[in-house]
Amino acid sequence: MKCKILVADLDGTLTLSRNTYELSVEALLALRKARDSGLRVVLATANGLDFALTIARYLGVRDVIAENGCLIHLDGVTYELCSGDMSIVDKVIISTGAVIPSPQNRCRKYDMAYIPLVKDTLEKVRAVVGTGYIVESSGYAIHVRPAGVDKGVAVSWLCRKLDVSCHQVATVGDSDVDVGMLSIAWGIAVGNATEAAKKAARVVVEEPSGLGFKEAVNLILSGDACTP
């Protein structure tokens, strides 16, 4: 079965490493190679939609999954997979003193991002928000969003919308927030991915981050991905 769609994470996957925001030239060239081969490329990121669309424009990508699956921009139309008001829980989280809000939160709707200030931040935030919310780390920030949605849910929605089997979708990621999309499709984890991401993926490539993405694209274009 041939891959039809490539869903790529951004931070830690298209970057030089998992602790920088600098994009990898090798990853960008691989992304262009994938796009030019006929694959439909989708950017899947924890970032807010406005930021994601801006980055996507410069990457030559049209379709975006933003806020860890809460929002999807497909063929020029934005779809919301979440509902609710995050302002109250946002105030509760900030009141712990364990985090500071990301500047992007002003432009976010459902997935709120926070910079941790203390140890065990995940546990502290989970304790105050209770059930009904997902709290996890991307390696760049702590993310809090309504339960029931992640990148995997978004990829599944995308497949139904485009009438494509999830077996014909290759996903590439590096962190815990990518687990959903790595497990629901033909997942490829870069070499320096978290253990959870590696466990969820079908394949773990040797190279890290951007170089790993290049390796993943070569695997996909060779025909060795999206196989039974």
From Swiss-Prot:
Family affiliation: Belongs to the archaeal SPP-like hydrolase family.
Active site positions, chain numbering: D9
Molecular function via GO: magnesium ion binding; phosphoglycolate phosphatase activity
Cofactor needs: Mg(2+)
Summary of the function given for this chain in its UniProt record: Catalyzes the dephosphorylation of 2-phosphoglycolate.
Entries under Gene3D superfamilies matching the protein: 3.90.1070.10, HAD superfamily/HAD-like
Keywords: Carbohydrate metabolism, Hydrolase, Magnesium, Metal-binding
Protein name: Phosphoglycolate phosphatase
Pfam families assigned: Hydrolase_3
InterPro entries referenced in this protein's UniProt entry, alphabetically: HAD-like_sf, HAD_sf, PGPase
Organism, as annotated: Pyrobaculum islandicum (strain DSM 4184 / JCM 9189 / GEO3)
HAMAP family linked: GPH_hydrolase_arch (MF_01419)
Listed GO CC annotations: cytosol
